[in-house]
């Protein structure tokens, strides 16, 4: 479990695996969670937080976001809202009626299932799961799937970045820190952030992604809180 806010958390070294020219040896680069959080928050920070936040909040209630509800929330005209929606990332999900059903969190099933307040939804990636509780001040029940073994990974994530009832206990999360803001898309960032049931299960992923980091779920939850706090400060 993580320590209280403001205190340093003793963490095992974060790993960055990189093969040499012969492909036989690996070098390990040590990065602090604070350094990773600073880089992540700078790249993940959106330019339309006042638009994205109500979308995320509504989806976590298990409901699509209608244009009418957004216009009311933002006090925006139809043309203004259409203009702003057009500026959202191209991977935002819409249903056939034109309602938003996915933006980081989604009503479209993925391998990352979340339950908050009795409402079920999904996320695009593992990092979205650990970012959500501190971002929205909620407790989340999580069930993900290891892409290698197909086995479930379950835990409870709290707003304070505490991880409860983790099973399997040695589960880890992969992460690739984007080099540029444009790299923070579902295809490039989200698809590389996964839960594995063990470091051994993640070995092949690390071999294929030499710039990937591997974190314990507790470390990942603490990182999620650091990023959420950073983005919140910048938004005020």
Give the residues covered by each predicted segment.
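Long, low-complexity, charge-rich intrinsically disordered regions
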Residues: 2-19, 121, 141, 151-236
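Short acidic, hydrophobic short linear motifs in intrinsically disordered regions
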Residues: 59-74
């Amino acid at each position: 479990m993580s320590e209280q806010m403001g205190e340093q958390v003793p963490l095992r070294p974060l790993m960055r695996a990189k093969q040499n020219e012969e492909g036989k040896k690996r070098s390990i680069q040590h990065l602090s969670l604070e350094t990773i959080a600073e880089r992540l928050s700078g790249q993940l920070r959106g330019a339309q937080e006042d638009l994205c936040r109500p979308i995320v909040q509504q989806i976590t209630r298990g409901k699509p976001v209608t244009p009418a509800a957004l216009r009311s929330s933002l006090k925006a005209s139809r043309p203004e809202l259409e203009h702003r929606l057009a500026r959202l990332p191209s991977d935002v999900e819409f249903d056939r009626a034109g309602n938003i059903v996915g933006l980081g969190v989604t009503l479209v099933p993925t391998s990352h299932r979340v339950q908050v307040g009795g409402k079920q939804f999904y996320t695009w990636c593992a990092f979205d799961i650990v970012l959500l509780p501190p971002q929205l001040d909620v407790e989340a029940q999580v069930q993900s799937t290891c892409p290698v073994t197909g086995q479930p990974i379950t835990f409870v994530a709290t707003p304070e970045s505490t991880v409860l009832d983790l099973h399997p206990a040695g589960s880890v999360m992969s992460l690739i820190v984007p080099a540029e803001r444009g790299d923070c898309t579902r295809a490039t960032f989200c698809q590389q952030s996964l839960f594995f049931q063990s470091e051994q299960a993640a070995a092949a992923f690390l071999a294929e992604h030499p710039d990937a980091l591997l974190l314990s779920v507790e470390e990942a939850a603490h990182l999620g809180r650091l990023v959420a706090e950073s983005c919140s400060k910048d938004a005020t």
